[in-house]
Amino acid sequence: MAHNHPPYPCFTVEICRRGLLGEPFRLIDVGVRGGVGEHWLFFGDHLELWGFDPLEEAIEPLRSANKRPGRMHYFTMGLGDKDEARPFRFYPENPPSSHFAASNGCNNDAIDSHWQQVQLRRLDTLFADGTIGPVDFMKMDAETYEVEIIRGAERFLAESGIFGVESETAFFRTPRNPRSHFVELFEELAPLGFDVYDAGIHRAPRAAMARGFPKLEGESYKLRPVGRAWVFDFLFLRGFEQIDASTSIDRLLKIIAVAETYGLQDVGLEILLTHKNRLSKRLDVEQAADWLVRDRTDTKLTYREYLRL
């Protein structure tokens, strides 16, 4: 999905490289097939990951290539609202269409040899038994089962310290989500203080222009995605408006870094300047403001210069 991830999040890189961030950035990736998103790798050795996929063939390559098993953890299991085994259908020709059998039976799935039993666990269970500790952020790409994951995470969401969720979702209605997936997902997250901050869009073009619209750039044409907005990738954040003296400096730094990671440098900069007295105990606030107006390695633009543009 097309979030505006900066090519070089200078603030995030610098607080990690200089040792200004005093604790890990803790991430859950639900649907980690193919590896964690490259934008998270800017946290470097500060990144601690719990990655989940229901199939061993997705997890085994990640485990085999894992050079940081102490902080990068991969699990062959799905997440949901129950601790159980459930049939899972994998489509090798189109992995994003793979899915669990619906728990309420509304999909009328015909379970045959193409399905396999996989383990589901609630986040509350994994949090209670210590498999997962404190968490800052969770990314979910679970092919419409994100609502069930949230419903199985009541204690986790209340006690883990998580302040951000990225989730694939959609507005069309189905028998399993009659009011739409987004409505049901937001109804679970909103009472916990999460608000919408960003959205990426995946478009579904009609067959007549499936390759995209030919946009002239210079002397050649570039194909620009077109089509109805079909699937979305929403960013939900909480606590950004209720920061107080109880919010640790490390948490402030991670909140600013996540805002930058999603191209919300204005949000990060406002937090930095609002809480400059506390943050100045850890870093040079003016220099940090400079980092937040840079997204490339070849610019030396400062915040003061930005204000004069």
Where are these regions (language model features)?
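SAM cofactor-binding core of SAM-dependent methyltransferases
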Residues: H5-P95, A101-S113, F171-T174
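A recurrent flexible, glycine/aromatic-enriched loop bordering the glycosyltransferase active site
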Residues: A110-Q116, P225-A229
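Conserved acidic-Pro-Pro-aromatic motif
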Residues: F25-R26, W40-G51, D129-D266, H275, ...
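C-terminal accessory extensions appended to soluble enzyme cores
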Residues: S248-L309
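Short amphipathic alpha-helix with an adjacent loop that forms part of the alpha/beta core around
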Residues: I15-G19, D124-T131, R155
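Switch- and interface-adjacent substructures of P-loop NTPase systems
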Residues: P96-S98, S103-D109, V118-G130
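Conserved residues in the N-terminal Rossmann fold of short-chain dehydrogenase/reductase
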Residues: F75-L79, Q117-L120, K139
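S-adenosyl-L-methionine
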Residues: M1-H3
